[in-house]
Swiss-Prot record:
Organism encoding this protein: Pseudomonas savastanoi (Pseudomonas syringae pv. savastanoi)
Function: May be a membrane-bound protein, possibly involved in IAA or IAA-Lysine transport.
Keywords: Plasmid, Transport
Official protein name in the record: Uncharacterized 21 kDa protein in iaaL 5'region
Any one annotated GO CC term: plasma membrane
One function term, GO molecular function aspect: antiporter activity
Length: 302
């Protein structure tokens, strides 16, 4: 079969003009992208187009379908901003912790070469896949807890949390064992260089257990808590900074690239555990065991 000249050029240069080849190529792509060049230059234009289309569709459904828009009242705007800011500002600050901590890890790993940076990228992808269940748990658990907290059914809330921690322990143990057993096949799958397999093997053999514990703490810190919004996001911020920078700096100077990776995981685990203790103490002091809204408990339905 004769090769398409446009496909050959794509393999050689990575850039194909949409007019090259037959006209069916344009129909195999989204009509909105017709006329947009491929390659790095076209990617940013495609991203801009898709973002604009998504924003317009979102506004249409919010305004015309859900009818959630209204005229802005300057009289009530300042009060609404203050009320929203009490929760939104700590959340924004807490969410800045992960990119800042990861940037420091990348800066510490950069002196060890591009292969070391590539290994950290592989480890990050493996973590996202291996512990995907743990990272999805808060989003699945919060609606259940919110419904039962609203009904003052604390027994069911306690049962759900206990079952969650049991699942985390079992899932984390099995995942850590699988990482140990599959360390070499995974390294071959990602085509890691021989000198950088040491970092990946260290993660699979030691970092898996540390990250399982850290992921469990991540799930705990993501759970809602009345009266302690600022504390909750503060203790999410502290582990990513205090638990990253000193440990990564020491590990890089003493153990090289392996020390950077293990220092990050060990530091996050230690400081996150201390942050959980501080969060629990602050919650007991601020709220205790009473309902902050002074509601009467709703009897369970038969």
């Amino acid at each position: 079969m004769r090769a398409d000249p446009a496909q050959c050029r794509l393999r050689q240069t990575g850039d194909v003009d949409p007019a090259d080849g037959d006209g069916r190529r344009c129909h195999r792509r989204s009509p909105a992208y017709c006329g947009v060049r491929s390659g790095p230059g076209g990617c940013r234009h495609r991203y801009l187009i898709s973002s604009l289309v998504s924003a317009c569709l979102g506004f249409y459904y919010v305004h015309r379908v859900a009818h959630l828009t209204c005229r802005v009242s300057l009289k009530n705007l300042s009060g609404d901003i203050r009320n929203i800011g009490r929760t939104a500002l700590p959340a924004v600050i807490g969410n800045l912790a992960t990119p800042v901590g990861m940037a420091y890890v990348m800066a510490a790993m950069a002196p060890f070469g591009s292969q070391a940076l590539a290994t950290i990228g592989v480890i990050d992808r493996v973590i996202q896949v291996a512990f995907c269940v743990v990272f999805a748990l808060p989003g699945a658990l919060i609606p259940i807890l919110g419904q039962n907290l609203g009904a003052m059914n604390t027994a069911r809330v306690s049962q759900a949390i206990k079952m969650t921690y049991g699942l985390l322990i079992g899932y984390g143990s099995v995942t850590s064992l699988l990482l140990i057993l599959l360390a070499e096949p995974l390294a071959s799958l990602f085509h890691l260089a021989a000198e950088r397999q040491v970092v990946f093997f260290a993660f699979c053999r030691w970092g898996g257990a540390l990250d399982a514990h850290r992921a469990a703490i991540h799930c705990h810190l993501s759970l809602p808590q009345y009266g302690a919004t600022g504390v909750r996001h503060t203790v999410r911020l502290v582990p990513r900074h205090l638990g990253t920078m000193p440990f990564v700096w020491y590990g890089a100077h003493k153990f090289g690239s392996v020390g950077v990776m293990l220092g990050q995981l060990l530091g996050n685990t230690i400081v996150a555990f201390c942050a959980c203790v501080a969060r629990a103490s602050a919650h007991e002091k601020d709220v205790g065991h009473r309902d902050p809204f002074n509601r009467e408990p709703i009897p369970p339905q038969e």
